[in-house]
């Protein structure tokens, strides 16, 4: 883990707790900020998909209504009107929104991992007992995933 390695590197270089915490927290916050931007792009695309579908529907309906004197042109224009709505809904609900949700999950996971690393590095710097550090870090795990402490 490069993040943890950089934290340990700061300890080895002899920086005090405030510097280590500040550098690592800034790194974590910037990563979260970058992930939020990516997620918001996909969320916006999910919001725009149905709207773009409705615009296509309006274009198809205008084409259909402008050629009412030709019955053969009504079907293809109606198909365009209906398909654009379908494509907009599919783009939003099958691609953009799930992708945005997955990015949000990954962002939360990375934020947690970096928070654990910051706590571990600061505990090491404070000279805490390894068993205390271990029990402190176990608190981040769900109870079912915690290994039983060795006696």
Features from the language model and the residues they span:
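Large intracellular
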Residues: 1-38, 109-151
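Helix-termination/interfacial motifs at the ends of transmembrane alpha-helices
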Residues: 27-106
């Amino acid at each position: 883990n490069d993040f943890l390695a950089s934290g340990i590197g700061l300890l080895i270089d002899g920086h005090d707790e405030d510097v280590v915490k500040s550098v690592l927290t800034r790194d974590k916050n910037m990563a979260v900020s970058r992930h939020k931007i990516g997620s918001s792009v996909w969320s916006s695309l999910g919001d725009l998909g149905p709207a773009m579908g409705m615009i296509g529907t309006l274009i198809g309906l205008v084409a259909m209504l402008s050629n009412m004197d030709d019955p053969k042109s009504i079907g293809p224009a109606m198909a365009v009107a209906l398909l654009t709505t379908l494509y907009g809904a599919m783009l939003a609900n099958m691609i953009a929104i799930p992708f945005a949700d997955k990015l949000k999950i990954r962002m939360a996971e990375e934020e947690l991992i970096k928070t654990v690393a910051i706590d571990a590095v600061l505990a090491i710097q404070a000279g805490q007992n390894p068993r205390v550090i271990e029990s402190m870090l176990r608190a981040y795990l769900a109870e079912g995933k915690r290994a039983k402490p060795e006696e």
